[in-house]
Amino acid sequence: MRDIVMTYWLFSSNNIRNIEICYNHMIWGFWDRNAGEKQKKNWRSFIRKYNQIKPFDVAVFQIAKTGEIHAIGVIKETYYDDQTPIWDNEINLNKVTFPWRVSFSVIIFSKEAVIKRFIKIQDYIDGYGLGELEHHDFNEILKAFQKKFGMISIK
C-alpha cells in the first residue's frame, strides 16, 4: 500500500460567513484573475499553487485580518472552473466571483475561533488568500481542534 503524502494549506477569508458557506456547501472558491490588481499580479503564482492542491490534503480556514481559525477540512478534489453562485456576493450579483473551486470530503467548523494565530507563510499568495502551512504550524492548529472537539487524528 502506498503512503499518502498530505500538504497542509492555509485558506484565508475576509469574513466568517464565507467559511460558513464553505462548510455548508463543502466547497471553497478562489477569485478569478480579473477580480482586481492583486489577482492579476499574482495570477501565475496562484495557478502554480492551485495545481498543487490534491485529494487528501488538509486546508485550514483563517480570517485574514484577525488570525482566527474557524475550520479545518480534508480536500476531496479541485475543479477547473465552476459557474454556480454560492457565496452571498455571487448570489447578489448573479455572477460567479470565486470560480476556482476546491471540494471537501469533511470539514470541521466552529463559529467561535478555535485558535487565534497569525501564521507567517513564505509563499503566501496575496489576493488569493492561499499558502502552504509548515508541518509544525499545522500540528499546533490540530491540537487546538483536538482540544475543542475531542479526538481528531491526522497522521
From Swiss-Prot:
It comes from the Archaea. InterPro entries: PUA-like_sf. This is Uncharacterized protein MJ1369. It comes from Methanocaldococcus jannaschii (strain ATCC 43067 / DSM 2661 / JAL-1 / JCM 10045 / NBRC 100440).
